[in-house]
Amino acid sequence: MRRIIKILVVVAVLYLAIIFLFANTRRVVPIHRQTPFPPTHPADLKIHDPSILKVGDKYYSYSVGPRIVIHEAPTLSGPWKKTGHVLDKDSIIPKGDRKAPWAPTTIEVAGTYYCYYAVSQSGCRNSAIGVATSQSPGPGGWTDHGAIIHTGTGPGSDSAPFDRSNAIDASVILTPDGNGYLNFGSYWTGIWQVPLNADLVSISDVSTNAARHLAYEPHAFSPGGKNPNPLCGDRSGSHPIEGAFVSYRAPFYYLWFSWGKCCKYNPKALPPRGKEYQIRVGRSTHPQGPFVDRQGVDLIEGGGEVVYGSNRDVYAPGGQGVLTDEGTDILYYHYLNKTVSLDFWEARLGYNPLIYIDGWPVAQ
């Protein structure tokens, strides 16, 4: 009997010890991962690097393609219809792919529409960001103002930060007090920001401009290249971060970006799982940062909270933006459907409403 009692006592002590151990062990929260991701809300639109506005009861999308393609739809899901182009001829910026400008972002301010776009050459940072304006969101009536900034070559390209960055993937955040900031950057030294003048189509003298470094991926995904052209191929290696977009929901500004390998996927040699395109975010109480993730890691140090990534048939979502529609923030992006094709031009529009938990966006 005493032996049985001793055994029961030992068991009870062990049980209590286990409870105490778990009660005093901090729950480990995985960094950079929100799992599982919800399914996408698909749309009937093939698109890459979308920019979406809602004007009245109609949605407008702007995307890479000849002279910047415009589509219109009654709902985000569609049906989407191509209605024309932003530019009526090639960009007036004399460099890069002038016929099909990249990654446009369109905003509306006081009845004027501003479409920011990039001209560049794949794998090189001989790039520029330009802007066109119109009094209407649809095709026709746009004025091309040309370049705001240059990298690689062109006016101001030898001044910091343009001497080390890549002027593509433009977006603009307009603060409640009316100040505009141009966000840009891809690979190389990551994402940068410069303040715009009040006209929103120019910046101050670059030699005195108050530029901010917002985000960077410090770890190279691949070795540096040996391209004889110093503007093509980063000799420090591939640092895949791009596609900056800043949204605001009081009291925070949110810096969204695409991280990981983008585009030109070989189905037989895909990047390691988790290294493909995904959508990350950091936040700040100031539009110029510093931006940090949930763990407090500065985005310049490689921080970033994953909000949406590959799941189910969705592969490599990115090129994102945030649209506020009837009080709800909606994360939209392009993605590839693994059951259809991984070809660049098979990317399609997807979206997810956002909720905020402890001030952090969560895709629904």
Curated annotation (Swiss-Prot):
Residues linked to a glycan: 337
InterPro entries: GH43_arabinanases, Glyco_hydro_43, Glyco_hydro_43_endo_a_Ara-ase, Glyco_hydro_beta-prop_sf
Signal peptide: 1-25
Pfam families listed in its UniProt record: Glyco_hydro_43
Chief location of this protein within or outside the cell: secreted
GO molecular function: arabinan endo-1,5-alpha-L-arabinosidase activity
Its job: Endo-1,5-alpha-L-arabinanase involved in degradation of pectin. Its preferred substrate is linear 1,5-alpha-L-arabinan.
Name under which the protein is recorded: Probable arabinan endo-1,5-alpha-L-arabinosidase B
Record organism: Aspergillus terreus (strain NIH 2624 / FGSC A1156)
Organism taxonomic ancestry: Eukaryota, Fungi, Dikarya, Ascomycota, Pezizomycotina
